[in-house]
């Protein structure tokens, strides 16, 4: 989970030498910072205790540039949720007892579309690459996953680029009582999600059934290394 320009420069240096160096970052490092999201009242700062920690805001533009230049290939989430009540609050009086991690899996694509493509930081194709194609290649799942092609699984998202909403713990579907991105206004959201040709999300409602997942045998190495 690359979070700083210092680490980004090391990755760029290795890639410039022709080494097979790959890296990813997470939405919290692209949208949150020490400057804007720390020093909150009470124990609120515990909501953004994770590893690596937040950095100064100036690192964000460097990370966006790394995504654009392909120094960074993927944006993941480091989704490791704990509720604020009764879990994060275990660290009141002792920082070392704060559970390390935060929720984020639900809003990865929306944040990157709204803050990346819509604001001109990355192209539409690049958004798809860092969210879908590159992860499939890295993990040895391409071309079964990560592309809409003959012979590939029909994993398809129909995207509404004009859908506007505000991220909130009151409306998200994650089983946690807070959001790291509470109050952030977003433009763009999934209208329909299909998995292997079956509609599992429609108009913000989930229709998937427990047990429908299938084992997928991966290649021994991803196509990114070839």
Language model: regions and residue ranges:
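C-terminal cap of metal-dependent C-N hydrolases
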Residues: 89-94, 100, 150-216
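A short acidic, glycine-rich active-site loop
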Residues: 47-58, 98-103, 179-185
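Predominant activation on well-ordered alpha-helical scaffold segments within soluble catalytic domains
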Residues: 8-12, 61-64, 109-114, 132, ...
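Residue-level signal for inorganic ion chemistry
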Residues: 24, 78, 112, 197
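Histidine/acidic residue-rich metal-binding segments in metalloenzymes
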Residues: 1-75, 83, 91
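Conserved active-site and cofactor/substrate-binding residues in soluble primary-metabolism enzymes
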Residues: 2-6, 58-62, 100-108, 122, ...
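Short, solvent-exposed cationic patches
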Residues: 215-226
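His/Asp/Glu-enriched, well-ordered alpha-helical/loop segment
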Residues: 42-48, 74-75, 81-161
């Amino acid at each position: 989970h690359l979070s700083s320009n210092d680490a980004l420069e090391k990755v760029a240096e290795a890639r410039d030498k022709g080494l097979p160096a790959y890296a990813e970052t997470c939405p919290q490092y692209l949208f949150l910072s020490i400057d804007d999201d720390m020093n909150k009242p009470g124990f609120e700062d515990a909501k953004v205790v994770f590893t690596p920690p937040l950095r100064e805001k100036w690192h964000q533009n460097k990370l966006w540039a790394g995504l654009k230049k392909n120094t960074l290939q993927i944006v993941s989430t480091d989704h490791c949720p704990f509720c604020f009540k009764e879990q994060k609050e275990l660290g009141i009086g002792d920082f070392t007892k704060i559970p390390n991690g935060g929720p984020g899996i639900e809003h990865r694509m929306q944040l990157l579309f709204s803050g990346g493509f819509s604001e001109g930081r990355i192209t539409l194709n690049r958004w798809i690459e860092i969210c879908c194609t590159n992860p499939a290649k890295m993990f040895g799942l391409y071309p079964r996953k990560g592309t809409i092609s003959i012979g590939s699984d029909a994993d398809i998202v129909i995207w509404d680029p004009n859908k506007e909403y505000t991220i909130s713990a009151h409306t998200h579907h994650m089983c946690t009582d807070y959001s790291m991105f509470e109050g952030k206004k977003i433009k763009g959201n999934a209208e329909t999600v299909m998995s292997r040709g079956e509609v599992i999300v429609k108009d913000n409602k989930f229709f998937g059934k427990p047990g429908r997942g299938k084992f997928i045998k991966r290649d021994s190495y991803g196509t990114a290394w070839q």
